Amino acid sequence: MADKLTPSDVKGLFEKLSNWGRWGKEDQRGALNFITNEKRVAAARLVQAGESVSMALPLATIPAPDNPNPVTHLMVQAGGDAHEQALPYSGDYFAIAPHGMANTHIDALCHVFWQNKMYNGFDASEVGSHGAKKCAIDVTRAGIVSRGVLLDIPRLKKIEWMEPGQKILPEDLDAACLPWLHERRIAVLGCDAVSDVVPSGYDGIMLPIHVGTLVAMGIHLIDNADLDAVSSTSVKLGRNEFLFSMAPLILERGTASPVNPLAIF
């Protein structure tokens, strides 16, 4: 595939790679349907060392340029109030806006739209002021357990980090692009940023990876994963594959959930 596609090429890919109707016209799970019971059993057999690694960032409570909606953490009851209670306890309250570039989260298939449609052709109007009636994040209520593979592009290129705006091409993954993901039946894609280059470089297409995965193929996205520890563990053990396990919160009608993805080697 050429390095630079035209906007028309990208729009054509959305149609060519579409999974709409693949699992029925009412399907809301998308590529999660690729994860069968047999695949979960096979993934469990990947555990050899028993080492479990988190791929989540701490919830960001401090305002920053990349965190305009910080997590609110308030104490409902604290230790200093214990003497006033028949049963002393501590408790807290959290308010989270999961989307953005600060917190590790999984996008629901209703998160973005293309030509006023979400995955499987459901209309954007299915998401209203009370949340999403279709393709909400609670379709993941049984958890996501499968084989995980780390694609460590900086290590492949023998560099410390990727430069801002630097693209990852298919040859980087075979020695990310939409056809590569489609051919391999990827169920979930995660990244230490937001998977898309910003700006995209394609007129009229703001987030082509988001549109191609969430809308066209029904692939859920994990944004802002912390991959440093899993990368170092991968190097130490000489393995890039592991048992992947994640249980998003059951947020009915939600467009996302904060998550703590685990890699178990």
Segments from the language model and where they lie:
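Active-/binding-site microenvironments in catalytic and ligand-binding cores
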Residues: 1-265
